[in-house]
Each structure stands twice: as C-alpha cells, then as structure tokens.
C-alpha cells in the first residue's frame, strides 16, 4: 500500500477526495491522509463508478438500497450488472429510464467499433465475424499474474466461443441487431497492448479501397503504418492524453486483406 502513496497524493492534488471503509481508513490515516467515510460518500454523490471486480456483489449488498435516482456504473467484467454502454456505439442507451450501466471492456469497444465501421455504417450484410483476442499478460503497472508463455483461453461458450463475442452480440442486440460472431482468446507474454485479429465475411464482395475509405471516415478507429505494438504503445506514451491512446482501436493498415467477400486484418 505505501508504495502507491504518491499516486493517491497526485489524485488529491487534482481535486479528488479520499474515502475508505472502516477497515482501510486507519491505514490511510497512518500515512497522513485525511480520509472521509465511504458510506457518507454513497449518500452525497449522484453517480457511483465501481471499478472493482465486485460490482454485482456491491449492487446486491449496497447500491440497490440507495436512492433510485442515482446512477451506477460497473466495469466490463461484471456481466449482468446492467445494459452495455460503449461510447460512440450506443450512446442513445443513456436516454433510457435506467439507473445502472455496464461499461463495455476495451476488447468489446474494439470489436464493436470494427463492426460499426466496416459493416453497420456501410449498410453491409455480415455473414460471420470471427475474432482472436491476443491479450497482454498483465499491465505495465503490475508485477503479478504475468504469463511466461502463450496461454489459451477455453472456448466455454458453445455459441460464441469466448465471452468477447458474446458481449458484443449482446451490445448490438440491445439495438435490435443480431450478428453472427465467434471469438477466441490467447494470453501472450507481453505487457504492451491487446492485439485483435479479425475476419469479416460479407454477403457481397468488397474492395480494399472501399474498406480504407470506411476506415478514413471512422470517428473511433484510427490507422497506423506501424506493425509492432511496442511502436504504437511508445507513440501513445509520448503523444497521447496522459500517455493513453483513447481510440477504440488502431488498425494496422498494411495488415488489411480483401479477398472477394472476406476482410481480414489486425487491430
């Protein structure tokens, strides 16, 4: 805990208030922090963003007992918390009479944006979309959970393979669109970014020129001539907002391949 003290101090300098439950409060106070009660903050704030892997548990034990006019947001792992929300994909869902939302994960945003750009925005009919998520082992800020060799994720969903395709299917199903999707995933020994392989099979033939034009017009997908994730990561670190790339995905232009009605590429 003490080695993250500087991170908390930086947030407080930017205007954040530190709140904690009774178990953690004494630890923070022993390091010199002013700490307010977590329970009090539940009452004072109108929007509660839960970034923990306990969103569903916290809803059942805490949030469901609070004022129903508050808004509750949970992270992508908490499937079933509420309807999916992906920025730029289904913003209209925020107008619904709903007080809790599930913020789609980075991979869900990535796949959804690819489908929006190359299928939905072009009024194409999709026969099938197949995706392989090449996932990083852990974040650059983490020491544990590193995988020293490629580790395969089980296909535990008969219809969709892994949860990645299922989540995107459910996201678009909320809009009345049912897409034929399948995903696989493998964890690689890297701390850089996730990489996504995709193959879209359309009802009719397409051309690379048309695909590149769709990519150029996309608001949330960017493109790059770089072919290594470390180069893309380095660019984001040097030039992105707080070192971040906030696009849904960065398409490697030279990876795009069109053969008749099939588009293949990496993001």
Enumerate the predicted regions with their spans.
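N-terminal Rossmann-like NAD(P) cofactor-binding subdomain of oxidoreductases
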Residues: 1-141
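C-terminal substrate-binding/catalytic lobe of Rossmann-fold NAD(P)-dependent oxidoreductases
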Residues: 1-36, 125-267
């Amino acid at each position: 805990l003490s080695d993250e003290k500087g991170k908390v101090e930086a947030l407080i300098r930017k205007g954040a208030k530190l709140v904690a439950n009774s178990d953690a409060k004494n630890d923070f106070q022993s390091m010199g922090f002013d700490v307010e009660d977590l329970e009090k903050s539940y009452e004072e704030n109108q929007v509660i963003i839960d970034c923990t892997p306990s969103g569903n548990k916290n809803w059942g034990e805490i949030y469901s007992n609070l004022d129903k006019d508050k808004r509750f947001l949970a992270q992508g792992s908490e499937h079933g918390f509420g309807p999916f929300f992906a920025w730029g994909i289904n913003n209209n869902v925020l107008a619904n009479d709903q007080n809790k939302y599930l913020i789609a994960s980075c991979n869900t945003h990535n796949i959804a944006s690819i489908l929006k750009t190359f299928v939905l925005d072009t009024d194409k009919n999709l026969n099938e979309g197949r995706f392989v998520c090449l996932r990083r082992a852990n974040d650059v800020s983490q020491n544990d959970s590193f995988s020293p060799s490629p580790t395969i994720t089980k296909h535990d969903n008969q219809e969709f393979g892994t949860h990645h395709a299922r989540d995107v299917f459910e996201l678009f199903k909320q809009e009345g669109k049912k897409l034929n999707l399948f995903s696989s995933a493998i964890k690689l020994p890297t701390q850089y970014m996730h990489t996504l392989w995709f193959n879209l099979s359309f009802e009719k033939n397409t051309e690379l020129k048309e695909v590149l034009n769709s990519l150029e017009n996309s608001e949330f997908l960017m493109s790059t001539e770089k072919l290594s994730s470390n180069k893309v990561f380095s660019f984001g670190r040097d030039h992105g907002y707080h070192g971040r790339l906030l696009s849904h995905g960065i398409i490697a232009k030279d990876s795009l391949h069109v053969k008749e009605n099939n588009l293949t590429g990496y993001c």
